[in-house]
């Protein structure tokens, strides 16, 4: 596992723990602003993990694909990056 994936995994586990806390807060009918703050913290963790995976992918899989002689493989990687980027900016 790459260092980026290891760091992303830590972020995902932290987000998972935070989501459990948020669910408990909602079930306990806690103050809305407190819940929203925790929600934003979870979103931040997920965005950071996404960025780590994206950077790792560009520096490994994407880079390798661009170094091949296969135009189809190159185009497939470009299309995948465009798809993920569009999803991330929605």
Model-derived segments and their meaning:
Residues 1-90:
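Solvent-exposed interaction patches of small proteins and small membrane subunits
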């Amino acid at each position: 596992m790459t260092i980026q994936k290891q760091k992303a995994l830590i972020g995902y586990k932290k987000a998972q723990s935070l989501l459990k806390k948020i669910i408990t807060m909602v079930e306990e009918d806690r103050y809305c602003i407190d819940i929203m703050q925790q929600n934003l913290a979870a979103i931040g963790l997920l965005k950071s993990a996404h960025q780590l995976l994206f950077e790792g992918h560009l520096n490994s899989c994407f880079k390798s694909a661009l170094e091949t002689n296969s135009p189809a493989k190159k185009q497939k990687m470009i299309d995948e990056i465009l798809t993920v980027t569009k999803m991330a900016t929605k």
